[in-house]
């Protein structure tokens, strides 16, 4: 808790400068996720807005994926799916988080075959044995 409080104070000080950079936006996203430990829920609208700023100013494949998932968590699942679909096939072909996100959003949209294929692809790209085991359990429960 003390480290989170210290991080929050640092983030507030950086925010007061009104010159958000890549790392400040990422830290703000992580801070929003930390709120779940205290409130029991993630402020997904805030997370989506922060990812929107990150995508606008510092676009990356990871930022686009995070934004897509955050949109889905605010109830805009189709919009999130559309963002995933807009990413370059070359950029995501071997990017495991993309395939996990695609599986998650596909399942929420009722695209179960596509979701299963995406999860299989994610499993094939996963090197960490614990993450792989988690994805295999998810696949078995799908």
Where on the chain are the PLM-derived regions?
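"A position-specific structural signal for the A-helix of alpha-solenoid helical repeats
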Residues: 26, 30, 66, 70, ...
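Amphipathic helix-loop-helix modules that constitute alpha-helical solenoid scaffolds
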Residues: 1-52
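Alpha-helical junction/boundary sensor with strong preference for TPR arrays
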Residues: 18, 58, 88-91, 126-129, ...
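Boundary/linker segments of alpha-helical solenoid repeat arrays
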Residues: 62, 91-99, 127-135
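Structural motif corresponding to the intra-repeat A-B loop/turn of tetratricopeptide repeats
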Residues: 38-41, 74, 109, 142
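Start-of-helix signal in alpha-solenoid helical-repeat scaffolds, especially tetratricopeptide repeats
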Residues: 5, 25, 29, 61, ...
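TPR/TPR-like (Sel1-like) alpha-helical repeat modules
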Residues: 61, 112-130
